[in-house]
Curated annotation (Swiss-Prot):
MF-aspect GO terms: actin binding; ATP binding; phosphatidylinositol binding; protein kinase activity
Record domain Protein kinase: where: 88-481
Protein function: Binds to and modulates brain Na,K-ATPase subunits ATP1B1 and ATP1B3 and may thereby participate in the regulation of electrical excitability and synaptic transmission. May not display kinase activity.
Domain PX: 14-126
Organism name: Rattus norvegicus (Rat)
Gene, per the UniProt record: Pxk
PROSITE patterns tied to this protein: PROTEIN_KINASE_DOM, PX, WH2
Alphabetized UniProt keyword annotations: Actin-binding, Cell membrane, Cytoplasm, Membrane
PANTHER family assigned: PX DOMAIN-CONTAINING PROTEIN KINASE-LIKE PROTEIN (PTHR22999:SF40), PX SERINE/THREONINE KINASE PXK (PTHR22999)
Gene3D superfamilies recorded: Phosphorylase Kinase, domain 1, Phox-like domain, Transferase(Phosphotransferase) domain 1
Segments traversing the membrane: none
Major place of residence: cytoplasm
Listed name of the protein: PX domain-containing protein kinase-like protein
Length: 580
């Protein structure tokens, strides 16, 4: 792919690692049985959901298929009599919901083909073993020296990747394993670059990479052949498992698990970090490190499945690191996955959840230090260390590796540029998915907080306080409105409230009624003996209010008095003497 050339348009492929959630919404009783309506959702978007209808017998069939795991799953028991009662159906519906919750909480079970077909039959109805056989048969037409011995059924966790035990016709005792895989959602290479890089893998030589004997690819899949190893993978060593057994049987509920000795942890860890650094320096994206992808050859670990990133397949731990926005490059993904691997080597089992709040006692504090730098809350929040930084930590810095094999992996400049662009596209999709999950988590937390009992109580208290405050404000506004009305009514002619005949005490709300009444006014002066002709009689004095209400109103009127509201008056002076 040329510089700055956009990846070719392609159809959107399903990411099998995106978690499915299922909710039993309702039930409907027919003549002889009951059907349960289940809402299934892929990922965080409610728009990406659908309904399925399942009977109890379908659940029972799924449960029988999962017995290979050895897990005791909480499927509600069968009932022959009274199984159509309303109360029984409601109780069974709750039990079936709990059954689905337990399965989907298990990382291995949630990714298995049995559950995917049960919940999403439209996308998982194909028989990938038959598809793989067809592709392999077409390949054998041009390469007749290979022969299929038997299919290795379900030895891996991927739904769209199948394995076959092979042999060469002229070397019947030598056993090989063929892996066939479909394209994944992160395939951003052009078809030409993709096929060239797949065919380049047999030329990769490194003491800690498991050799590829043969590799070829079509526009839609890839096929690789490697030597079959009877000892199996690092995960087989930890879980005491047989390599040919199904993945669910080997790793879902192992009877015996054992962590490795400290020296093994140091040696294997150093070897794996060295090969990761080699790939990072070459610009080759990996992102698929886990214990089942590390082959054991004597006392040496060798990395498997370099083709996965070229095919665009999602990582085994993708549902973990999509929760943390700082794990947003393939290098940081490799370091985080190394933390999972180191935990499994140390304790003989994967962590119950990630991030890990506290680590159990280990054979060395140096082990815990590396685990804390890759799996702790702080590490997941702030970001992963580099591979070079891990190599400098005390757990690995003093490990001496002795090997005579010189690493070789020549990638042409054009293909290296294509890998760089594809890597950026993979990281961009990862970043976008992490952003969506982060926004969804914030929205969910806000909705949960808004609907919590504590938040409802707080809103009730605030509403009560607001109601009391409004009532107080309304009660304070009433006297003001009353005084304004009185003021506007007496602002024209003379009014007893504006009479200056008696002073009024300072107004204080609530105190006017408590003050003693004023002393009675002095008696009016005696009237004149007789009015002179043409003079007007003075108006008789008005009675003065003696109750507290009128006193308060009087004070309010005086305080609110505005000179501009008075009407202009025309004065007629009759004091001048009249001359007859």
């Amino acid at each position: 792919m040329a510089f700055m050339e956009k990846p070719p348009a392609r159809k959107v492929l399903l990411d099998d690692t995106v978690p499915l959630t299922a909710a039993v919404e309702a039930s409907q009783s027919l003549q002889s049985h009951t059907e349960y309506i289940i809402r299934v959702q892929r990922g965080i978007s409610a728009e990406n959901s659908w309904q399925i209808v399942r009977r109890y017998s379908d659940f029972d069939l799924l449960n029988n298929s999962l017995q290979i795991t050895g897990l005791s799953l909480p499927l509600p028991p069968k009932k022959l009599i009274g199984n159509m009662d309303r109360e029984f159906i409601a109780e069974r519906q709750k039990g079936l919901q709990n059954y689905l919750n337990v399965i989907m909480a298990n990382h291995v079970l949630s990714n298995c083909e049995l559950l995917k077909k049960f919940l999403d039959p439209n996308n998982y109805s194909a028989n990938y073993t038959e598809i793989a056989l067809q592709q392999v048969s077409m390949f054998f037409r041009s390469e007749p020296k290979w022969e299929v011995v038997e299919p290795l059924k379900d030895i891996g966790w991927r739904i769209r990747k199948k394995y076959f035990l092979m042999k060469i016709k002229n070397q019947p005792k030598e056993r090989l394993v063929l892996s066939w895989a479909d394209l994944g959602p992160d395939k951003y290479l052009s078809d030409k670059d993709f096929q060239c890089l797949i065919k380049l893998l047999p030329s990769c030589v490194h003491p800690y990479i498991y050799r590829v004997t043969f590799a070829t690819a079509s526009e839609s899949s890839a096929l690789l052949i490697r030597t079959f190893n009877d000892k199996g993978t690092l995960k087989d060593l930890i879980y005491k498992a047989k390599p040919k057994d199904p993945f669910l049987k080997k790793y879902c509920n192992p009877k015996k698990t054992q962590g490795l000795e400290l020296q093994q942890i140091k040696t294997y860890g150093r070897q794996i970090l060295e090969v990761l650094k080699f790939l990072h320096d070459k610009g080759f994206p990996y992102g698929h490190l886990h214990a089942a992808n590390v082959m054991l050859d004597g006392n040496t670990c060798r990395l498997l499945d370099l083709e996965n990133s070229l095919l665009g397949l999602p990582s085994f731990y993708r549902s973990y690191f999509t929760q943390f926005r700082k794990i947003n490059t393939l290098e940081s993904v490799d370091v985080h996955c190394f933390g999972h691997l180191l935990y499994e080597m140390t304790y003989g089992r994967p962590p119950d959840s990630v991030p890990v709040d506290s680590f159990p006692p280990a054979s060395s504090m140096a082990v815990v230090a590396v685990l804390e730098s890759t799996l702790s809350c702080e590490a997941c929040k702030n970001g992963m260390p580099t591979v070079s930084r891990l190599l400098q930590m005390p757990l690995f810095s003093d490990v001496l590796l002795t090997t005579s094999e010189k690493p070789q992996f020549k990638i042409p400049t054009k293909l290296r540029e294509a890998l760089r662009i594809a890597k950026e596209c993979i990281e961009k999709r990862l970043t976008e998915e992490q952003k969506q999950i982060h926004q969804h988590r914030r929205l969910t937390r806000a909705q949960s907080h808004h609907g919590s009992e504590e938040e409802r109580k707080r809103r009730k208290i605030l509403a009560r306080k607001k109601s009391k405050r409004s009532a107080v404000e309304n009660s304070e506004e009433q006297p003001v409105k009353h005084s304004n009305a009185n003021n506007s009514a007496g602002s024209g002619a003379s009014s007893p409230l504006t009479s200056p005949s008696s002073p009024t005490p300072p107004s204080t709300a609530g105190l006017s009624s408590a003050l003693p009444p004023p002393p009675p006014p002095p008696p009016p002066p005696p009237p004149p003996a007789g009015p002179s002709p043409g003079t007007e009689m003075p108006a008789p004095p008005l009675p003065q209010a003696v109750n507290g209400v009128n006193r308060g109103a009087l004070l309010s009127s005086i305080q609110n008095f505005q000179k501009g509201t008075l009407r202009k008056a025309k004065t007629c002076d009759h004091s001048a003497p009249k001359i007859g």
